[in-house]
Amino acid sequence: MDYSFDTTAEDPWVRISDCIKNLFSPIMSENPGHMPLQPNASLSEEDGTQGHPDGNPPKLDTANGTPKVYKSADRSTVKKGPPVAPKPAWFRQSLKGLRNRASDPRGLPDPALSTQPAPASREHLGPHIRASSSSSIKQRISSFETFGSSQLPDKGAQRLSLQPSSGEAAKPLGKHEGGRFSGLLGRGAAPTLVPQQPEQVLPSGSPAATEARDPGVSESPPPGLQPNQKTLPTGSDPLLRLLPTQTEKSQGPVLKMPSQRARSFPLTRSQSCETKLLDEKTSKLYSISSQVSSAVMKSLLCLPSSLSCAQTPCIPKEGASPTSSSNEDSAANGSAETSASDTGFSLNLSELREYTEGLTEAKEDDDGDHSSHQSGQSVISLLSSEELKQLIEEVKVLDEATLKQLDSIHVTILHKEEGAGLGFSLAGGADLENKVITVHKVFPNGLASQEGTIQKGNEVLSINGKSLKGTTHNDALAILRQAREPRQAVIVTRKLTAESMPDLNSTTDSAASASAASDVSVESSAEATVYTVTLEKMSAGLGFSLEGGKGSLHGDKPLTINRIFKGAASEQSETIQPGDEILQLAGTAMQGLTRFEAWNIIKALPDGPVTIVIRRKSLQPKETTAAADS
């Protein structure tokens, strides 16, 4: 049966290529002109005469000793085989050369080494050189895919063999490996050649250093070959220059950290220059308090963890007078002995004025208040003489009105354990209605409650040397959490008084200060009457809603009645009216409380009669407001 294709029966719409026809042609099985699978397989005379009509056997190539059967097949009249024929012998020799090059890290030998007496090495080196030139692209692809460590010395050796300065150093290596290369065509040459590389790398640098630098410069080909030039003494200089650059890069982020912290929490007096002329007094107070807290915190961080052991060497810094040195020693030792059990102590900034009168005079007026003098000496003893003199010079410049406000500023130092809280919470922030950051709540069993200086409603100026002026609420909470880590905490607080409130409003917002001043003028002109009212507490409450309070939308306002609910007992009795200020509720003062805290007090009351003290304005301001509304 004939399996050959009939040319007349072909489909005109489907074209069959010649290679597919040859696959099914019976001539393929009889065609002797195919290339042999084995390069050294001998051809019979009968096959040779069939493949060649002239009767001449195929000639051998003098270079590689393989029969050129594929050339005679092109000349024959027989149909050619498919294009996927077996690979010729020269390609197999090139594959052997690639394997030898992968196992040999020394790369190509010098062309001048062809005059060697061994004929066998000449036969194998010839195809190897040709294979390296023709298959360099394949070698690069294979090295790119593998990224093995054995390929890196191969590239480095190839780079070295092309340089004229490295030719002299590579010649003795090529002569030494020339005889061995002819006999070791497989992978057996790898164990004898690879261990020799670290011996040459060690004089210029350790192998660990080269492995650490290679990934950093392996992105581009020219820099990637530089680490392997360590085998030559001339190539080690540029590599050693890379070391200081790497160290500079590693030290870069470390040097930037203090600057970032300084920018995020400014502690210097640069803030006083940015404020307005009306805010000079408050800015001076902020700068002085920040300097005191930062100086005290800096000295505490320089001391050991135990403060009792560290206060004694700080006393000679302050003790400038021989007459007061004994008193300071006893005071500091007394505070040092109680530091383990005591929660802390505080210093009023007004005590700095006493040091302006003279550092050499002993103050006998403070003997009556020995505890405050003792705590003041303990805090001031932590400051160095330069910092103390600088603070004294700034205090001398202040006027009398500003010096009076120093009485309300306290520097409190709390002794605690690592990870313990300070015992109070914060309220307010630059992003909230209440711009000033104040103490929201003092916990009953906390450190601040045991020490006694920090009270609810006090303004917090700084914590551990970090100023809270102009910070947001989240930033203030982050500073408060950071104060858990050290064993000591330095908190600068300011007691808010009626005189200091307008100053605070002017520093935060000029519009808010203007509205506050207008409200004060209205309240002063209007006459107010105080009433005592008894209401019935039900499950729904007292029957009215509140507005105002500390930290409200319009600032710190008194708690007033906003709206009276319909159907409540208070509506029927008409004892209270919208706008009445609540002064006292069931014996609890309502001044300085937020609206949320006032509601918590109302919810905690039992059901029954509740006594409320309210303050109601006269009818004259109400009539004016009604006329203005109309």
UniProtKB/Swiss-Prot annotation:
GO MF annotation: an example: CD4 receptor binding
One cellular-component annotation, GO: extracellular space
Domain of life of the source: Eukaryota
InterPro entries attached to this UniProt entry: IL-16 (IPR020450), IL-16-like (IPR055287), PDZ (IPR001478), PDZ_sf (IPR036034)
Record protein name field: Pro-interleukin-16
Subunit field text: Homotetramer. Pro-interleukin-16 interacts (via PDZ 2 domain) with PPP1R12A, PPP1R12B and PPP1R12C. Pro-interleukin-16 interacts with GRIN2A. Pro-interleukin-16 interacts with GABPB1. Pro-interleukin-16 interacts (via PDZ 3 domain) with HDAC3.
Any GO BP annotation: cytokine-mediated signaling pathway
Sequence segments annotated as region (Disordered): 30-268, 316-343
